[in-house]
UniProtKB/Swiss-Prot annotation:
The lineage of its organism: Bacteria, Pseudomonadati, Pseudomonadota, Betaproteobacteria, Burkholderiales. One of its GO terms (molecular function) is GTP binding. Residues 170-186, 295-326, 349-361 have a biased composition (Low complexity). Residues 107-129, 146-387 are annotated as: Disordered. PROSITE patterns: G_TR_2, IF2. Residues 512-516 are annotated as: G2. It comes from Albidiferax ferrireducens (strain ATCC BAA-621 / DSM 15236 / T118) (Rhodoferax ferrireducens). This is Translation initiation factor IF-2.
Length: 978
C-alpha cells in the first residue's frame, strides 16, 4: 500500500503542516507529527470529513456553467458609403459536469462537439469561493422567506374562506326557516272553505303573500351565494395549487443553488482530472464542395438545407448537434476552450461558396447584398432592425472637478460633445467644445442629461505637502514675537519704528507716506523683536490684512492730536479677525494740542478698553520725536509675548509667508518672506504659491548677505522662477520635481477657475450690458515696483468706475515698463501708469513714435486724482435750462403768406433770436417752440433787451392772443465730476 508523510501531503495540498494535522485530528485520524505516515484509507477518511463539513451533495450529478462575454467594435460602410461603428458582442460559455465516477466532463454547447481534452478546472481563490457561498446562502434565505410568506398567505386565505362559509351557512338557515313558515301558513289558508261570493281582500292574506314573496327571494339569494361560494372555493383551490407549484419551484431552485455551491467547493478542494477521449464514430466521406475556399472537414456529414427564410425551430440546435457529432472542427483545435454562442455561430459565406437559399439574408449583417431587388435588401434591414433589442440608457456617475471643459465632460458621460453643447444652449449658455465650465454649471448639466453628478475628490498633489510637513517632527523652541505696526496715515508709525531701529526710513519715502510693507528685526536688552510696518492709506487694505495675518501682536498707533480715524477702525477689525492682542501706542504726546484722554474714550467706543478701565489692552503714551515711552512700549510687547508662549520648531524645513514681492531688473524675481517655523538656508527648494525656485541668495533688511534664517526672521530671497503673489504661503520642499509639479498644478488650476468665472460673469451680464447701452471704457496698464503697490493701485482705480465710465485693467504687473507693454498699449489704446518705476530707452522711443501716453507716479494720491479727472471729462455733461427773458404780446397783426405777427414788449431779461420759448396763457404752458423771425421796426435783430418793443413770428404756430406771455430760455451743458 502506497503511503506518504504528513509533511509531503501538506506540501502537495499547498497547506501548512499544522492545518493538515488539525484537519486529520478532526477527521479521526490520529497523527501528531509531520513525519507520520499516511495511507490511502487515512486520505479517504479526510476526504469524507471535508465533504461532509463543506456540505457536498452525494452522488447526484453536478453541472457548472461559466459564461464569458466580450465586446468589440468594427467599422463598416453602409449603403450610402458612410463609415459606421458597429459594436459586436460575443458570448461564450463552458459547462462542467461532475459525474458519478468522479470524472469532470466539460460539456460545450449542443451545436458543438466535445473537445478531446478538458482543460484543468480554473483555480478560484478563497475570496471568490467565499463570495459564492455567501450568494448561495442569501439565495437560500430568500427562498425560505418566500416560503414563509406563501404559507402565511395560504393560512390567511383559509381563515377568510372559513369565515365566509360560516356566514353563508347562517344565511341559508335563516332563509330555510322563513320558507317553512311561509309554506305552513299557506297550507292553513287552503284548508278553510271558500265563500261563494268574493269578499273584500283580507289583510292576513296580503301579509301571507308578502311573506311568500320574501321567502322566494331569500331562496334565490341563497342559491346565488352558494354558487359564488363554490366559485370562490374553486379559485382558492387553484391559487393553493399555484402556491404549491411555486413553492416546489423555489425549493428546486434552492436545492440547485446549494448543490452548485457544493459542487464548486468540491471541485476547488479536489485536484483537476482529465476526461477520457470520447469513442470515435465511423468516419463518413463528405462529397467535395465546388467553389469554396475551405478544405472539407474529415468525417463531416452533409446537413439538410433549411427552407428559405424559415425561422429555426427550438429543437434545431440539438438536431444539428446530433447530425454533426462526428465532425472535426479545425477551428476548435486552434481556439481556446471558450465556446461561442451556438445561436450566433452560423456559416459566414465566402467568395464563391454555394450557400443555402436564404442563408445570407440573416448572417451577412455587415453590409447589404450586392445585386438583387432593392425591396429584398430593405426587407433584410427591416428584419435586422426588428430583431435589435432596445437599449436602456446607462446612468453614469460623473465625477466633476472644479473646472472641466465641454469635451472632457462629454467624454465622461459617453456622449458626443454636440449633445452637451445642445443641452447647454437649452439652459441659456453659448459654449464651444474647448470652453471650461465651472463645477456648479457642469453638475447641473449632468443631472439634466440623466446622469449622477458627484463632486470629484481633488487629485491635488498639494496633499503630499501636507504629509511631508506632518512627518517632520522637531522640538519646538521659544521664538521672537512678530509685531505689526498699524494705524491711520500720518499718525507716526514709520517714525516710531525709525526711533526704535535708530534709522531714518520715513524721510526717504515719497510724499512722507509708507506704500510698502517694511520688515525689520531689532535686538533689545530682553530679546529680539520682529517688526512689520504697514501702510496707513485706505488703498492698502490688502497689505494691512496680510500684516495682521502674519503677526503675533499688533501695535495700534493713534495720534494724540487726531484721535481715532477710519483706518484706525479698520486696523482694529483686522486685529480682531486675526485674533491677536493689541497694544495701543498714543503717539505725538509732545505736541501742545495732544489729548490722550479723548483717544482713550474714542477707542473704548471701538471696544478697545485700556487696562486701567478694566480691559485687556495696555495703553502707552509715546513720542517718536523725543523717544518718550519707547522703552515702556517694548516692555509691554515683550510681556505680551511671554504670556503667549510663542514656540516654533527650528531644526525643520522652513515654512512662512510672502510679505512682498517685486521684479528687479538685475536680480530677477525677489520676494520678502517671513520665516514662521523651521530654518531657511541658501540652496533650499522653495515653493511659494504657483512659483518655485532654489534660494540663490538671502539678504536681511540692511542688505547684508546671510546663510540661514530662523523663525520670526524676515529675509529677502532670490532665485524664484516668477514673482509670487504677496500673501502666499511658502515652504521648503525636499524634491525640486515635486515642487515643479505642485506649482504647475496650482497655476493651471488658478487659470481654469479664473476663465470659468470670467465666462460665467460674461454670460450673466450679457443682456444687462445690451440693455444699458454703450459704456465708455478707460483702458489702463499698471506697472509697479512691488506686488503690493500694484495690487493697491489697481483696487483704488477700479473703485472709480461708474455706470457710464468704467476702468478696464488691461494688464498689471511688477517691474520696469518694457517694449512689450508699449505694444500692448498700442493694440488696446491704453494709458500706461508707472508707479515707482520707469520705462527703458526702447520702450520710451516706441511710445513717442506711436503716441502712447506713459504717466509716472510716486504717490498713490496723485495717480487716483489724475485718473478721476480724466474720467470726469469722459462723462456726458448735464443739460441745464436757464430762463433769459420774458415778453408780453400787446398786439397781433395778420399778414397773408406769413401768419400772425406778435407785437411784444420785453418785460424782463433779453429776447434772443436763437433761444427757445414757451407760450404761457393764464400761467399755463400752451406751446413750446422757437422763433421764426425777430424784428425791431423793419430790421432783423439778434436780440432785444428789456424795456424795448419788437415784432416776432413763432415758427409753425399762429394761435396767439393778446395778453399771452412768451418765456425765453436756453439749454446749457454743465460738466460733471465723479
Amino acid at each position: 500500500m502506497f503511503s506518504t508523510t504528513v509533511a509531503e501531503f501538506a506540501n502537495e495540498l499547498k497547506k501548512s503542516t499544522a492545518t493538515l494535522l488539525e484537519q486529520l485530528k478532526s477527521a479521526g485520524v490520529a497523527k501528531t507529527a509531520a513525519s507520520d505516515k499516511l495511507n490511502d484509507a487515512d486520505k479517504q477518511r479526510l476526504l469524507s470529513y471535508l465533504q461532509s463539513t463543506h456540505g457536498a451533495a452525494g452522488a447526484e450529478r453536478k453541472k457548472i456553467t461559466l459564461v464569458k462575454k466580450s465586446t468589440t467594435e468594427i467599422k463598416q460602410a453602409d449603403a450610402s458609403g458612410k463609415a459606421r461603428t458597429i459594436q459586436v458582442e460575443v458570448r461564450k460559455k463552458r459547462t462542467f459536469i461532475r459525474r458519478d465516477d468522479g470524472v469532470e466532463v466539460s460539456a460545450e454547447a449542443p451545436a458543438l462537439e466535445t473537445e478531446q481534452e478538458v482543460e484543468a478546472a480554473p483555480q478560484v481563490d478563497n475570496l471568490e469561493l467565499a463570495r459564492r457561498e455567501e450568494e448561495a446562502r442569501r439565495q437560500a434565505e430568500l427562498i425560505r422567506r418566500q416560503e414563509e410568506e406563501l404559507s402565511e398567505r395560504r393560512r390567511q386565505r383559509e381563515e377568510q374562506e372559513a369565515r365566509s362559509r360560516e356566514a353563508s351557512e347562517k344565511a341559508a338557515a335563516v332563509a330555510a326557516e322563513a320558507a317553512e313558515a311561509a309554506a305552513a301558513q299557506a297550507l292553513k289558508k287552503k284548508s278553510k272553505p271558500v265563500a261563494p261570493e268574493q269578499p273584500a281582500p283580507n289583510p292576513t292574506e296580503i301579509e301571507t303573500a308578502k311573506v311568500l314573496a320574501a321567502a322566494e327571494k331569500e331562496q334565490h339569494l341563497a342559491k346565488e351565494k352558494g354558487l359564488a361560494r363554490e366559485k370562490e372555493l374553486a379559485e382558492s383551490k387553484a391559487r393553493a395549487a399555484e402556491d404549491v407549484v411555486r413553492a416546489a419551484d423555489l425549493g428546486d431552485r434552492r436545492r440547485k443553488a446549494e448543490s452548485e455551491a457544493a459542487a464548486i467547493r468540491l471541485m476547488m478542494s479536489s485536484p483537476a482530472k482529465k476526461a477520457p477521449p470520447p469513442p470515435k464514430k465511423p468516419e463518413e466521406v463528405k462529397p467535395a464542395m465546388k467553389g469554396t475556399l475551405h478544405k472539407p472537414a474529415a468525417g463531416a456529414v452533409p446537413a439538410k438545407p433549411a427552407k428559405p427564410g424559415a425561422p429555426g425551430a427550438p429543437g434545431a440546435p440539438a438536431a444539428g448537434a446530433a447530425a454533426g457529432a462526428g465532425k472535426e472542427v479545425k477551428s476548435a483545435k486552434l481556439s481556446s476552450s471558450w465556446a461561442g454562442d451556438p445561436a450566433k455561430k452560423k456559416g459566414i459565406p465566402t467568395r464563391g461558396a454555394t450557400a443555402a437559399p436564404g442563408a445570407g439574408r440573416s448572417t451577412n449583417w455587415r453590409a447589404p447584398a450586392r445585386g438583387g431587388r432593392r425591396g429584398s435588401s430593405d426587407r433584410d434591414r427591416d428584419d435586422h432592425r426588428v430583431q435589435a433589442a432596445p437599449v436602456e440608457q446607462r446612468v453614469i456617475e460623473v465625477h466633476v472637478p472644479e473646472t472641466i471643459t465641454v469635451a472632457e465632460l462629454a467624454h465622461k458621460m459617453a456622449v458626443k460633445a454636440s449633445e452637451v453643447i445642445k443641452h447647454l444652449m437649452k439652459l441659456g449658455q453659448m459654449v464651444t467644445i474647448n470652453q471650461p465650465l465651472d463645477q456648479d454649471t457642469a453638475m447641473i448639466l449632468v443631472e439634466e442629461m440623466g446622469h449622477k453628478a458627484i463632486v470629484a475628490a481633488l487629485d491635488d498633489p498639494e496633499a503630499f505637502t501636507v504629509d511631508e510637513v506632518s512627518q517632520q517632527q522637531s522640538e519646538s523652541l521659544p521664538r521672537a514675537p512678530v509685531v505689526t505696526v498699524m494705524g491711520h496715515v500720518d499718525h507716526g508709525k514709520t517714525s516710531l519704528l525709525d526711533y526704535i531701529r535708530r534709522a531714518k526710513v520715513a524721510t526717504g519715502e515719497a510724499g512722507g507716506i509708507t506704500q510698502h510693507i517694511g520688515a525689520y528685526h531689532v535686538e533689545t536688552d530682553r530679546g529680539m523683536i520682529s517688526f512689520l510696518d504697514t501702510p496707513g492709506h485706505e488703498a492698502f487694505t490688502a497689505m494691512r490684512a496680510r500684516g495682521a495675518k502674519a503677526t503675533d501682536i499688533v501695535i495700534l498707533v493713534v495720534a494724540a492730536d487726531d484721535g481715532v480715524m477710519p483706518q484706525t477702525k479698520e486696523a482694529i477689525k483686522h486685529a480682531r479677525a486675526a485674533g491677536v492682542p493689541i497694544v495701543v501706542a498714543i503717539n505725538k504726546i509732545d505736541k501742545p494740542d495732544a489729548n490722550p484722554e479723548r483717544v482713550k474714550n474714542e477707542l473704548v467706543v471701538e471696544e478697545v478698553v485700556p487696562e486701567e478701565f478694566g480691559g485687556d489692552s495696555p495703553f502707552v503714551p509715546v513720542s517718536a520725536k523725543t523717544g518718550q515711552g519707547i522703552d515702556a512700549l517694548l516692555e509691554q510687547v515683550l510681556l505680551q509675548a511671554e504670556v503667549l508662549e510663542l514656540k516654533a520648531p527650528v531644526d525643520a524645513m522652513a515654512k512662512g509667508l510672502v510679505i512682498e514681492a517685486q521684479l528687479d531688473k538685475g536680480r530677477g524675481p525677489v520676494a520678502t518672506v517671513l520665516v514662521q517655523s523651521g530654518t531657511l538656508k541658501t540652496g533650499d527648494i522653495v515653493l511659494a504659491g504657483s512659483t518655485y525656485g532654489r534660494v540663490r541668495a538671502m539678504l536681511d533688511e540692511n542688505g547684508r548677505t546671510i546663510k540661514t534664517a530662523g523663525p520670526s526672521i524676515p529675509v529677502e530671497i532670490q532665485g524664484l522662477t516668477e514673482v509670487p503673489q504677496a500673501g502666499d504661503e511658502f515652504m521648503v520642499m525636499a524634491d525640486e520635481r515635486r515642487a515643479r509639479e505642485i506649482a504647475t498644478y496650482r497655476a493651471g488650476k488658478f487659470r481654469h477657475t479664473k476663465l470659468a468665472k470670467q465666462q460665467a460673469a460674461k454670460l450673466e451680464n450679457m443682456f444687462t450690458d445690451m440693455a444699458a447701452g454703450e459704456v465708455k471704457m478707460v483702458p489702463i496698464i499698471i506697472k509697479a515696483d512691488v506686488q503690493g503697490s500694484q495690487e493697491a493701485l489697481a483696487q483704488s482705480l477700479l473703485k472709480l468706475s461708474t455706470d457710464e465710465v468704467k476702468v478696464q485693467l488691461v494688464y498689471t504687473a511688477v517691474g520696469a515698463i518694457s517694449e512689450s507693454d508699449v505694444n500692448l498699449a498700442i493694440a488696446s489704446k491704453a494709458v500706461i501708469i508707472g508707479f515707482n518705476t520707469r520705462a527703458d530707452a526702447g520702450a520710451r522711443k516706441l511710445a513717442e513714435n506711436n503716441g502712447v501716453d506713459i504717466r509716472y507716479y510716486d504717490i498713490i494720491y496723485d495717480a487716483v486724482d489724475e485718473l478721476k479727472l480724466a474720467m470726469s471729462g469722459m462723462l456726458t455733461p448735464d443739460k441745464k435750462e436757464e430762463v433769459i427773458g420774458t415778453a408780453e404780446i400787446r398786439q397781433i397783426f395778420k399778414v397773408s403768406k406769413i401768419g400772425s405777427i406778435a407785437g411784444c414788449m420785453v418785460t424782463a431779461g433779453v429776447v434772443r433770436r436763437t433761444a427757445r420759448l414757451r407760450l404761457l396763457r393764464d400761467n399755463m404752458v400752451i406751446f413750446t417752440g422757437e422763433l421764426d423771425s425777430l424784428k425791431r421796426f423793419k430790421d432783423d435783430v439778434r436780440e432785444v433787451r428789456e424795456g424795448f418793443d419788437c415784432g416776432l413770428n413763432i415758427k409753425n404756430y399762429n394761435d396767439i392772443q393778446e395778453g399771452d406771455v412768451l418765456e425765453f430760455f436756453e439749454i446749457r451743458e454743465v460738466a460733471r465730476t465723479l
